[in-house]
């Protein structure tokens, strides 16, 4: 197994101690998809902070919206450099990693380092308008998630438990309700 890609669906945590221990024992990286669970937690720690990297979507129907776009988080400096280049046409100058930039210059001494395109990529840089939208919503994320949790409880209380599953483990969740 090269990696485990785990999706936290509809605001529910997909992690367990058993899974995290297994991945640690086997040295298998975890990649978290937190697109539908912004602000949700596992053991009082935010989802998206457990793995090698995580992704968040800011599509209009998710917990936070910049109308379109998303974000990838990682503590790995090499992955960070690659992602920064990938979002910006593959330009080496976007790496924001001095060691990586130096290696690129050493490997390409005859080329202007400002115009080295290392691989085919895209222009998926966010706009300042999107950033303003996202930051304004980030301030209200916890409050909005509390409302979602209250709505979820009310919804479950009004379902017929003999016909529908109503015993969800909602600790740390940030449901869509």
Each predicted region: which residue ranges?
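Active-site phosphate-binding strand-loop segment of PLP-dependent enzymes
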Residues: 1-66, 71-73, 77-81
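PLP-dependent aminotransferase class I/II
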Residues: 3-7, 12, 16-18, 25, ...
């Amino acid at each position: 197994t090269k990696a485990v890609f785990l999706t936290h669906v509809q605001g529910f945590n997909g992690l367990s101690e058993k899974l995290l221990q297994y991945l640690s024992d086997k040295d298998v990286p975890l990649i978290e998809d937190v697109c539908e669970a912004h602000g949700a937690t596992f053991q009082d720690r935010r989802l998206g902070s457990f793995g090698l990297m995580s992704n968040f979507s800011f599509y209009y129907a998710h917990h936070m919206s910049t109308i379109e776009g998303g974000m990838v988080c990682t503590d790995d400096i090499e992955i960070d450099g690659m992602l920064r280049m990938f979002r910006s046409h593959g330009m080496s100058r976007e790496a924001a990693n001095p060691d990586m930039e130096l290696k690129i210059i050493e490997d390409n001494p005859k080329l202007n380092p400002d115009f080295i395109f290392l691989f085919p990529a895209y222009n998926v840089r966010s706009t300042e308008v999107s950033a303003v939208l996202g930051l304004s919503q980030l301030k209200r994320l916890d409050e909005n998630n509390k409302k979602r949790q209250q709505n979820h409880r009310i919804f479950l209380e009004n379902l017929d438990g003999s016909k529908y599953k109503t015993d969800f483990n909602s600790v740390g969740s940030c449901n869509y309700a």
